[in-house]
Every structure is written in C-alpha cells, then in structure tokens.
A protein has these predicted regions:
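C-terminal motif of bacterial Sec signal peptides marking the signal peptidase cleavage site
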Residues: 14-17
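Acidic, metal/ion-coordinating pockets
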Residues: 19-23, 29-359
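N-terminal leader/targeting segments
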Residues: 11-12, 193
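A taxonomically broad motif for mature regions of secreted/extracellular
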Residues: 5, 23-24
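Sec-dependent signal peptide recognition
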Residues: 2-9
Length: 359
C-alpha cells in the first residue's frame, strides 16, 4: 500500500462533522549560499542544465462496495459475512495486482462500518463490522467515498463509527458536502469532493471544486452519487453537472449509484466516469447485471508542474468469480469473451440493452 498523507479535511454541508486531524506542511528550511572565489588559472567547469523528467502516476477507480449485507436478505447462508469471514484479502484477491501497482485505489464504500446502532426504516439497509476496514488496509485501497444513500443506514451512530474507523485507519474519505485533500508518497496532491444526488446544488459544488483548485491541488476529483438506478445512460442533469465541474477545475468525475456501468466521456481536459456500477457488493446475492470494471487513469506531471491526464486503461470484470450467484469477488473477464466486449460497449456508449427497472 502506498503511504497517504492526509493534509486536511474541509467541511461543508455535513450530516455530521467529518473533520480529520490536520497535518501541517513542514516549514521551508532557510538556504545559506556560500560565495567562493575561483582562481583565474582554473577553468570553470561547464554545467549542462537539465530539466527533471516528467512524473507519471496511476490511479485506480472502482464502483460500489458493500462490506456486509442486508439483515433481512434471503441469501444469508452464503452472504458477505459468511463468505468472507475474517479473510480480509478475499474480496479483492483477483484484482489486487492492479491495486498494488497504482498510487491510489478509490472505491465507493456503500454502507456504514459499525458494530452498534439501529437500522433505518427503509427497504435496503446495509452494514459491515468495523473489522472490515481491514479489507481496505490489506488490499491497497487508499481512499474512499462515503457520499452515498446508504452511509446513514444505521443512523448517526453508524455514520460516526464509520468516520472514526476510517480516520483511525488513516484512509482519506469524503462524505456529503465534504472535501478531503491528501498527498501520495510520491508527492501528488489530490483534492476530492463528494455529493449525494438529493443535495446536488450545482453552484455550491462548483464553488467547492474551484476552491480545491485554488488550494493548490495537483488533481481535483469530484465523486457524485447520482443518476437513475439500473440506467445505462446518464441523465441530462448528470451531463450538465459533470461538464460544469470540469469547467470549474475538476480533472476527474467519478460517479456511482446506478449499480450498472454508464459511459466514460472525455470532456475538454477532463474525464467523466458517469457510473462505475457494483464491485464487491454484499448488498445483492443475485444481481441482475454482473458487469463491472477497473478504470486506471494515468496522471502526468511535467517538469514545470503542469498536471495532465494520460492514458486510460480499462479492465472489464465480473462482480463474481463464480457462475449463478454473487460471491463478492470481482474477477477480470478474459479479452475476447462476451463479458469483456459487453463491458467495453457499456463504457463507450454503444450498448443497446434495455435499462433495468428500479427495485
């Protein structure tokens, strides 16, 4: 796992405070210049000025991860808790190779990590134990979004437990209206902002995105939880908001909520992942769509400090490593298979399948 330095966490529209400890940047040391006199008989050496080479970073984005299950589900006998047990490397065993090669792996943590609390009165409620934070720390997952509609499934108690658990593990995160700024071990400073669909105020979001850019972030990422469940295409409002935040200074829009893949769009100098679908999703033992993907985005920092996006690598995958049901272990499709081609079509917008009805 790459070491992540949490610089500071900004709070905006919060269900509760998601402030994290502030780590101040070290003071710049004073530099003393010593003057020397070179004898006239000595030739000055010729110095060839060389610019430092450009730096390349790799970021991995995946979709919805529910480490736990709905207590009222009908597949408890082989649900997430029973399947995983204390084998915290199990969920990402078939994708860890990609996670370990990057600077930061991002996932949407859909559901609280809490050992106490009462479930909300709603159809789908999810919860995982606080021990499941080890799934993140043991699998090179460096940052998460908890800006989603399941974070409060166990009320304020569950939410507070999740925040405390992530903070204690040193994992940067964003919730609704929350901005996090952190730096990778190799010095890439990332600003991350999260928002949920029922509080997507464009003007306010654009303001915070611009603020992250003004704060000196090398890279700005917006993590919206938005769109229509089961829809393979973004809504007009998604498109408009995505374009607005990139115009305001965001580099990457990393969307979630529909539980299916939606297209990737290159817009100006940025890129938009409208929906990443499910990934290791304990909330459904029999999903109607098993397709998912890992998206690996290259980031290039030039010698003058300019940061641009490089190549995007797509790894099409199945949310399960077995046929017939979900075993919560995402596994890449082999190139040339129907699943591989189907994922690529969903991401390039050429998929012609019908949307799934909301359940």
């Amino acid at each position: 796992m790459n070491r992540i330095i949490v610089l500071f966490l900004l709070t905006a529209i919060l269900l509760t405070s998601c402030a994290a400890p502030v780590e101040e940047a070290p003071a710049t040391p004073e530099m003393t210049v010593l003057e020397t006199t070179v004898p006239e008989t000595t030739e000055s050496p010729t110095t060839v000025a060389t610019e430092p080479p450009e730096e390349r970073f790799l970021l991995t984005f995946v979709g919805d991860c529910t480490f736990g299950a709905n207590p009222s589900n009908t597949y408890a006998g082989y649900g997430f808790p029973k399947t995983v047990g204390e084998d915290y490397q199990y969920p990402f065993r078939n994708v860890i190779t990609w996670f370990e090669k990057d600077e930061v792996t991002f996932l949407n943590l859909e559901g609280p990590l809490s050992d106490t609390g009462n479930p909300m009165q709603k159809k789908h409620v999810f919860r995982g134990t606080t021990a499941y934070v080890n799934i993140l720390t043991e699998n090179s997952v460096e940052a998460v979004s908890i800006a989603n509609n399941h974070t409060m499934d166990y009320g304020q108690t569950g939410y507070d437990s999740t925040v405390e658990t992530l903070q204690n593990a040193g994992i940067p995160f964003v919730g609704q209206g929350c901005s996090s700024i952190f730096s990778t071990e190799n010095g890439l400073t990332i600003g991350l902002f999260g928002a949920v669909y029922y509080k997507l105020d464009t003007e306010e979001i654009v303001s915070y995105i611009a603020g992250l850019r003004d704060a000196g972030c090398d890279l700005v990422i917006f993590a919206p939880h938005w769109g229509v469940e089961g829809s393979y295409r973004p809504t007009d409002s998604q498109v408009n908001l995505a374009h607005a935040v990139i115009d305001a200074g965001a580099d990457i829009v990393w969307g979630s909520h529909p539980h299916v893949l939606q297209p990737v769009e290159k817009y100006k100098d940025g890129i938009i992942f409208y929906s990443m679908g499910n990934f290791s999703f304990g909330g459904n033992g029999y999903p109607r769509d098993y397709d998912t993907a890992l998206l690996q985005q290259e980031v290039i920092r030039s010698a003058d400090g300019t940061v641009t996006l490089g190549d995007l690598t797509i790894i099409p995958a199945n949310v399960s490593s077995i046929e017939g049901r979900n075993n919560f272990q995402p596994t890449p499709y082999e190139q040339g298979t129907a699943g591989y081609d189907r994922v690529m079509q969903k991401l390039d917008g050429s998929w012609k399948g019908s949307n799934l009805p909301i359940q």
